[in-house]
């Protein structure tokens, strides 16, 4: 009987943990504008799993259909959009504010765990070379990097 209780408790905790992970992923995906189609989550971490205001960086795969539209339309893909995306001040890369490392560290400093593979290198490369786009509000930043097939969302607060 004691063993069944322990196994049941552990199973319940595991299911609860998986639920929190899925809810967290869904929550941060909701900040990506609707007309930017994203695929799998390449990297995600944030303070307190979205329970309170925190700091985090989330990297998603950019799907080919959006990549081709961005490649064709350029900056107008973002500036001509309605809703959330059209209201942001989108700028093309290279990011002039990232010429000094202390500036970019601010937006990516929430990365608390090791970034898999060469993902950080791809983000830095995309931000420092032409072909990508970025926008920011006081607490949120988006980078769309078609050449790297990445969408980066970071938040503070």
Set out the residue ranges of the language-model regions.
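Functional cores of ribonucleases/endoribonucleases
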Residues: 77-148, 157
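Amphipathic alpha-helical dimerization/oligomerization modules
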Residues: 150-152
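Positively charged n-region of N-terminal signal peptides that target proteins for export
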Residues: 1-4
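Secondary-structure transition/turn motif
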Residues: 64, 155-157
């Amino acid at each position: 009987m004691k063993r069944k209780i322990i196994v049941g408790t552990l199973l319940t905790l595991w299911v609860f943990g998986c639920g929190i992970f899925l809810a967290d992923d869904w929550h941060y995906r909701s900040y990506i504008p609707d007309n930017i189609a994203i695929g799998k989550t390449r990297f995600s971490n944030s303070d307190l799993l979205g329970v309170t205001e925190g700091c985090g960086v989330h990297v998603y795969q950019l799907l080919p259909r959006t990549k081709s539209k961005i490649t064709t339309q350029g900056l107008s893909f973002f500036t001509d959009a309605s809703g959330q995306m059209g209201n942001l001040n989108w700028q093309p890369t290279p990011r002039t504010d990232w010429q000094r490392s202390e500036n970019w560290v601010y937006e990516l400093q929430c990365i608390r765990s090791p970034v898999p593979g060469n993902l950080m290198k791809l983000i830095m490369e995309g931000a420092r070379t032409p072909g990508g786009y970025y926008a920011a509000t006081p607490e949120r930043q988006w980078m769309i990097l078609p050449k790297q097939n990445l969408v980066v969302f970071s938040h503070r607060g």
